[in-house]
Regions:
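A short, surface-exposed loop/turn module that caps and links secondary-structure elements
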Residues: 31-58
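Enriched for short, Lys/Arg-rich terminal
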Residues: 3, 8-16, 20-27, 57-64, ...
Length: 87
């Protein structure tokens, strides 16, 4: 299991997802990524360019969320994690 950390931008975007009624779909995808960031389906894309090293998953045709995986096992609040997923 991976620990999910939200960036400031992601926290702001959550409000937009709620207004577009996409927050439930986004939560489902985040749970999938939390358990296994490389799980298929739903499919993920490796990004290139400025976002090299990051991955994305589609919320719908127009929206997607981008995340970065930091493969570094650690303990947080007495829970063992395989790494961090930064959204």
């Amino acid at each position: 299991m991976y620990r999910v950390v939200y960036t400031k931008r992601a926290v702001k975007d959550i409000k937009n997802l709620k207004s577009a009624k996409l927050d439930n779909k986004a939560r489902e995808l985040i749970e999938i990524v939390k358990n296994n960031p490389f799980q298929n389906p739903p499919f993920y894309e490796k990004l290139v360019g400025n976002l090299y090293g990051a991955y994305s998953r589609r919320i719908n045709i127009q929206h997607r969320f981008v995340y970065e995986i930091i493969e570094q096992p650690h303990v947080y609040n007495e829970t063992d994690y395989d790494g961090i997923v930064k959204i």
